[in-house]
């Protein structure tokens, strides 16, 4: 059965854990018929408390059972040449791409006492430089060849303070600014550019204490789930989302 994204190729970065937002995005796009090329970086992901070591193969099998092609490759997005390398591999495998989802991020707690140039550079490389260069190279290779979608994951750094995350918030804010202006730059090529802020999302790493603290701040009475932003991203990736561009969309369940 033909679906909204049948035959299209989506590239999603930052996909490692089966319960993560990246995996939820991949599942939702696959349900709509998109073939998938996924990346993750075990060197960073496996250090996280909710790491998903060894789950990539299971996720690929799950996606393939939905009737789409799916590939995964490790990729260190902190490398300056990573965007070009990724698009070379994608073109060799699928020849074309229609959707880019910049989901990968780098986050380490910091403070006035610990913030330094190295920490800023590490955040900038993954949270700002990589998605910008991935997006620019995507447009260079596939722009003007029909509808294309660029969707980036962001956070609520422009809505209020996020203490202990100085490097993270400033580098994510740069991606927000890029989204707004890049949408205007490439609209004439049939490309939409948007960002999604999912708010606090329980993807398996929240402690019970954190869950209790956050719950009362959601107007809709529950914590965010990985599937919530995935639904919105599938809409933005599809034909119905073609009139939305240059926007940072807040899909936060009324969180404040």
Predicted regions and their residues:
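A conserved structural motif in NAD(P)-dependent oxidoreductases
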Residues: 218-229, 240
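Short, small/polar-rich loop/turn modules that mediate ligand/substrate recognition or access, typified
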Residues: 187, 192, 244-246
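Canonical Rossmann dinucleotide-binding motif of NAD(H)/NADP(H)-dependent dehydrogenases/reductases
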Residues: 3-41
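Alpha-helical segment proximal to the catalytic Tyr-Lys
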Residues: 140, 180, 184-185, 242
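Active-site helix of classical SDR
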Residues: 135, 171
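Catalytic Tyr-X3-Lys loop
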Residues: 98, 106, 113-132, 151, ...
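Substrate-binding pocket helix/loop in short-chain dehydrogenase/reductase
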Residues: 111-112, 119-121, 206, 214
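Short C-terminal tail/terminal secondary-structure segment
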Residues: 159-160, 212-217, 234, 245-256
